[in-house]
């Protein structure tokens, strides 16, 4: 616990960088992403909700993003992300450095979760790789018998994501399909042994809007307490350059 402030300070100093899934088209510095989702598993039933994210391409190699999610009285989430492209090859492959901060609130449990993460990413023609570390606080726990409140700190959890795409993901395609294996998504970071497996699909409209869908399985339970794969989720949304 005594090293916690220093750890988060290092994350902040190492950041000022943001993360965008794909470069924003020229002339469109802002990109709005919205999706609805349905999530169900045996342990906690079903829930629905939606999310909005806004990305700002502040410079050719720098992007800043904000986002919020609401999940039918189960959780409310917000995040701030930042990414810099630190290397671009002749084939347009990119090496990025990403910093993100995630806040989640669970009203029924009176819990709040704060997570800071730092990642590197590699974007190639058909494969995207991400690897990083995060620190997590879980605060405002249920009062103990002595009337006090506690805080749980989880240092240095590993984050990873591997995505494979049918078409070259570095250039525009009318459609694309892919597979993803990771322990996190936009507003959830699981422990490294709790994995998400999903299939993704993208379709581009003439006005540069992209429709997308993602369906997969994921660990069940709340706050990373179990890892049995009997749950599934569905995301449906669109990405619109502004």
For each of these PLM feature ranges, what is it?
Residues 1-29, 242:
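Cleavable N-terminal export/targeting peptides
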Residues 20-73, 239-241:
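Short glycine/proline- and aromatic-enriched beta-strand/turn motifs that initiate or cap beta-hairpins
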Residues 30-32, 60-66, 89-97, 125-131, ...:
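Repeated loop/turn-to-beta-strand initiation elements of outer-membrane beta-barrel proteins
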Residues 34-42, 68-74, 86-88, 101-107, ...:
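Transmembrane beta-strands of outer-membrane beta-barrel pores
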Residues 44-50, 74-80, 110-116, 125, ...:
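Residues that define the transmembrane beta-barrel architecture of outer-membrane proteins
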Residues 53, 81-87, 117-121, 161-165, ...:
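Outer-membrane beta-barrel architecture
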Residues 115-186:
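Detector for outer-membrane/organellar transmembrane beta-barrel domains
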Residues 191-242:
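Predominantly the C-terminal beta-signal and adjacent terminal strand-loop region
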């Amino acid at each position: 616990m005594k090293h916690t402030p220093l750890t988060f300070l290092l994350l902040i100093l190492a950041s000022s960088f943001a993360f965008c899934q794909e470069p924003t088209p020229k002339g469109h510095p802002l990109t709005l992403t919205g999706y609805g989702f349905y999530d169900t598993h045996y342990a906690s039933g079903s829930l629905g909700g939606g999310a909005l994210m806004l990305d700002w391409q502040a410079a050719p190699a720098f992007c800043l993003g904000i986002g919020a999610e609401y999940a039918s009285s189960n959780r409310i989430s917000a995040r701030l992300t930042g990414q810099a492209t630190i290397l671009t090859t002749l084939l347009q492959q990119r090496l990025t450095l990403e910093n993100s901060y995630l806040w989640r609130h669970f009203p029924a449990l009176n819990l709040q979760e704060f997570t800071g993460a730092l990642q590197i990413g590699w974007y190639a023609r058909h494969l995207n790789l991400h690897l990083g570390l995060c620190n997590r606080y879980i605060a405002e726990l249920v009062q103990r018998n002595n009337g006090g409140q506690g805080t749980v700190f989880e240092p240095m959890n590993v984050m990873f994501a591997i995505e494979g795409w049918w078409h070259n993901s570095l250039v525009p395609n009318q459609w694309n399909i892919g597979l993803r294996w990771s322990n996190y998504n936009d507003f959830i970071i699981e422990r490294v042994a709790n994995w998400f497996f999903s299939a993704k699909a993208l379709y581009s409209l003439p006005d540069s809007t992209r429709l997308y869908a993602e369906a997969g399985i994921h660990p069940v339970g709340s706050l990373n307490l179990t890892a049995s794969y009997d749950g599934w989720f569905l995301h449906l949304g669109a990405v619109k350059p502004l």
